[in-house]
């Protein structure tokens, strides 16, 4: 708000005038004094009324217009104030305060160059005027902020633009252009509530402001409320048919909505290849639309998971959470892909993030399941040791044991180096452990459920794999390995 401006006193006329003129001037002076009194009490509306009465009585008095301009400035009505200030200096070009008020109005409205001209004229009339000197510096500062902001906007350094506009608005509080630029940059930074607030304030004063309508639409567009956004873009284009930014945004919004809907339709119909292509095309429309693009990445990740391209699905979900780190659905999708690829630590991390954000029973159970799989993954994988899947039958487990036990039996590697013998002995023991657990339904159930087998009284530390081997192949002395045949050994039952 502009600083309170001083009111001017009209000197009595020195030359005799007609009685009617003198009475009019006396009455006008009375109205002016009443206006001054209300101004001093900060009742600017009443002050405005009395200054207007004074002007009606004496429309050629420059100071009356100057006083009313000062009052309008205090009411924040800078455009009207500018008209009065300009009229005051038209009537009296030597009226320093008139030039100061004209410059102050120009500056408040964001026209810093015009403000400089007014302040320069005031300094020509009174070169020692401290207010004119300071206001001239302020106007030049605003021009510098404008220049920096223009360059930084081209560089997409939106934070710097917001900073410059905040500084400029300290001197130009009524400049819609600065406010709109700030609001647009706030929207580009994802600070939508702040941007909406600035645009809404302007629209309350001017409901036809195309720039403000565009910014309102831009915020909705970036918040993925595309239908509502299009309505604002269309309204902005009605107000200003040549509004280039609104035109581009409207076109992008419609294209993005159509591609996304087509992709969703293809996905529901099970046409995953087409859905992938459509989501990919949608992602190329507007890289600035972070929220919508996060959803598109997540959708494409879901498609990739359906196509069993799990690494690609993980990458898409990662891109989604990079754009929107609060996007729960993307974390859940990525966590499931991590589970499917046995990356349990990563899955636990994602489920922990989800559960910290939304503490539901479902999310808690997903986290517990991932933690269990992580615990199980750190034990020996007996299925992998035998080379069977988790649904292997009893016969398949026996066949696998026979094959692996013979493959790793120490006698078969008696001629190998000490290092190889040690490694094969270790593998032979693990094969026996695996068979002991997986061939026993109760032990297998406990193993599959992730229970600590040692705590269940099945400590494998003293386990002797030879006992299993002998029992499996028919007792002691019932087998031997010799260097013979293509396999360099032969097996013989007793």
Swiss-Prot record:
Residues 381-451 form the J domain. It comes from the Eukaryota. GO terms for biological process: chaperone cofactor-dependent protein refolding; protein folding; regulation of cellular response to heat. Its main location: cytoplasm. The modification Phosphoserine is found at residue 393. TPR repeats lie at residues 28-61, 62-95, 96-129, 142-175, 177-209, 210-243, 256-289, 294-327, 328-361. Acts as a co-chaperone regulating the molecular chaperones HSP70 and HSP90 in folding of steroid receptors, such as the glucocorticoid receptor and the progesterone receptor. Proposed to act as a recycling chaperone by facilitating the return of chaperone substrates to early stages of chaperoning if further folding is required. In vitro, induces ATP-independent dissociation of HSP90 but not of HSP70 from the chaperone-substrate complexes. Recruits NR1I3 to the cytoplasm. PANTHER family: DNAJ HOMOLOG SUBFAMILY C MEMBER 7, DNAJ PROTEIN P58IPK HOMOLOG. This is DnaJ homolog subfamily C member 7.
């Amino acid at each position: 708000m502009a600083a309170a401006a001083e009111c001017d006193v009209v000197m009595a006329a020195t030359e005799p005038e007609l009685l009617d003129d003198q009475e009019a001037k006396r009455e006008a002076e009375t109205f002016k004094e009443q206006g001054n009194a209300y101004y001093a009490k900060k009742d600017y509306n009443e002050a405005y009324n009395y200054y207007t009465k004074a002007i009606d009585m004496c429309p050629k008095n420059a100071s009356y217009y100057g006083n009313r301009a000062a009052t309008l400035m205090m009411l924040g009505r800078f455009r009207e104030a500018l008209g009065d200030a300009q009229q005051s200096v038209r009537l009296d070009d030597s009226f320093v305060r008139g030039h100061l008020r004209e410059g102050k109005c120009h500056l408040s409205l964001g026209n810093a160059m015009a403000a400089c001209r007014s302040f320069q004229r005031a300094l020509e009339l009174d070169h020692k005027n401290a207010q004119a000197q300071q206001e001239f510096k302020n106007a030049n500062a605003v021009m510098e902020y404008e220049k920096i902001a223009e360059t930084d906007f081209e560089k997409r350094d939106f934070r710097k633009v917001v900073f410059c506009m905040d500084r400029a608005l300290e001197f130009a509080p009524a400049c819609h252009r600065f406010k709109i630029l700030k609001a647009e940059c706030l929207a580009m930074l994802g600070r939508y509530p702040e941007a909406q607030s600035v645009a809404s304030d302007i629209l309350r004063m001017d409901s036809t402001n195309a720039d403000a309508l565009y910014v309102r639409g831009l915020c909705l567009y970036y918040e993925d409320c595309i239908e509502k956004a299009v309505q604002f873009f269309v309204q902005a284009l009605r107000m200003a048919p040549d509004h280039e930014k609104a035109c581009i945004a409207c076109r992008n919004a419609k294209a993005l909505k159509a591609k996304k809907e087509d992709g969703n339709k293809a996905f529901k119909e099970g046409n995953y290849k087409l859905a992938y292509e459509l989501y990919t095309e949608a992602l190329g429309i507007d890289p600035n639309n972070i929220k919508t693009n996060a959803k598109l990445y997540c959708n494409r990740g879901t498609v990739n998971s359906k196509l069993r391209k799990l690494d690609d699905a993980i990458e898409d979900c990662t891109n989604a959470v990079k754009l929107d780190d609060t996007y729960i659905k993307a974390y859940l999708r990525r966590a499931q892909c991590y589970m499917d690829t046995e990356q349990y630590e990563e899955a636990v991390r994602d489920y922990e993030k989800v559960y910290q954000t939304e503490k539901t029973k479902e999310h808690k159970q997903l986290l517990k399941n991932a933690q269990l799989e992580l615990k199980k993954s750190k034990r020996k994988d007996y299925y992998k040791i035998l080379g069977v899947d988790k649904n292997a039958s009893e016969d398949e487990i026996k066949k696998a044991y026979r094959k692996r036990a013979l493959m790793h039996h120490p006698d078969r590697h008696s001629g190998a180096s000490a290092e190889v013998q040690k490694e094969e002995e270790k593998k032979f023991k693990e094969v026996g452990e695996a068979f002991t657990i997986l061939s026993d339904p109760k032990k297998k159930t406990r193993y599959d459920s992730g229970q600590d087998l040692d705590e269940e009284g099945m400590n494998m530390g003293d386990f002797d794999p030879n006992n299993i081997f002998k029992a499996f192949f028919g007792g002691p002395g019932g087998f031997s390995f010799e260097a013979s045949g293509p396999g360099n050994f032969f097996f013989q039952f007793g």
